[in-house]
């Protein structure tokens, strides 16, 4: 594909935006806003299951003045859950080379499969970073795997609010309170692994595990 200013601008803009999140002196850590797996699905342009075949460090663009580097992962796509209208069979995904810009390190040439969520840039390349939801497929719960096919997509009209301390309240009927951090001091706890924020016919959203309503202890603890 010939180099174009628009394509170079896309890469430059993404990398600069990531760099702005980590000003000088903050260190090498990558920080991301918390998001439930359902939110990751709804906010991503592409969601696929894939194996990683190889990796290669490449320039971010063909512009000689651009010194940014990317890791290009060659993948074998197993299944696409979202992004059909923008892409068909994905061969490569790209991530920042620098860990300070949230570059993702994936295992290559192994039997491990990944769930990858990411964005599709204006030049058609798929871009992923640590603030996306990227997990080994074997670590996903049965509810998460099933929800990738239907429930996440069907309930993107629901809003998920992270609860850090009690009391937590919702401000709209289409909100669900995400309490994993409050109860377990980790983001991807029981609620993230086993529940979906689903909308009723009356427009009200609440947590469901398959056909089961959210366990009572989750409801009790968020009451003022």
UniProtKB/Swiss-Prot annotation:
Expressed in brain, heart, ovary and skeletal muscle. Coiled coil: none annotated. One of its GO terms (molecular function) is metalloendopeptidase inhibitor activity. It comes from the Eukaryota. This is Metalloproteinase inhibitor 4. Belongs to the protease inhibitor I35 (TIMP) family. InterPro entries: Netrin_domain, TIMP, TIMP-like_OB-fold, TIMP_C, TIMP_CS. It holds the Pfam family TIMP. Gene3D superfamilies: 2.40.50.120, Tissue inhibitor of metalloproteinase-1. Chain B, domain 1. Disulfide bonds join 30-102, 32-131, 42-156, 158-205, 163-168, 176-197. Complexes with metalloproteinases (such as collagenases) and irreversibly inactivates them by binding to their catalytic zinc cofactor. Residues 30-33, 99-100 are annotated as: Involved in metalloproteinase-binding. Residues 30-156 form the NTR domain. The record marks 69 as: Involved in metalloproteinase-binding. It comes from Mus musculus (Mouse). It is found in: Secreted.
């Amino acid at each position: 594909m010939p180099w174009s200013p628009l394509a170079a601008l896309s890469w430059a803009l993404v990398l600069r935006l990531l760099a702005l999140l980590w000003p000088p002196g903050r260190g090498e850590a990558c920080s991301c806003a918390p998001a439930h797996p359902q939110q990751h699905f709804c906010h991503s342009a592409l969601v696929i299951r894939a194996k990683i075949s190889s990796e290669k460090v490449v320039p971010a663009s063909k512009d000689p003045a651009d010194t940014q580097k990317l890791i290009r992962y060659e993948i074998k796509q197993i299944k696409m859950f979202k992004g059909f209208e923008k892409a068909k069979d994905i061969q490569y995904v790209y991530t920042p080379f620098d860990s300070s810009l949230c570059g993702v390190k994936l295992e290559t040439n192994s039997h491990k499969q990944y769930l990858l969520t990411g964005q599709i840039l204006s030049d058609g390349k798929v871009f992923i970073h640590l603030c996306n939801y990227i997990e080994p497929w074997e670590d996903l719960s049965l509810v998460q795997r099933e929800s990738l096919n239907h429930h996440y997509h069907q309930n993107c009209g629901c809003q998920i609010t992270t609860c850090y301390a009690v009391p937590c309240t919702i401000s709209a009927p289409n909100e669900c309170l995400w309490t994993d951090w409050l109860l377990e001091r980790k983001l991807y706890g029981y609620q993230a692994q086993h529940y979906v924020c689903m909308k009723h016919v009356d427009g009200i959203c609440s947590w469901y595990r398959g056909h089961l309503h959210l366990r009572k202890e989750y409801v009790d603890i968020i009451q003022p």
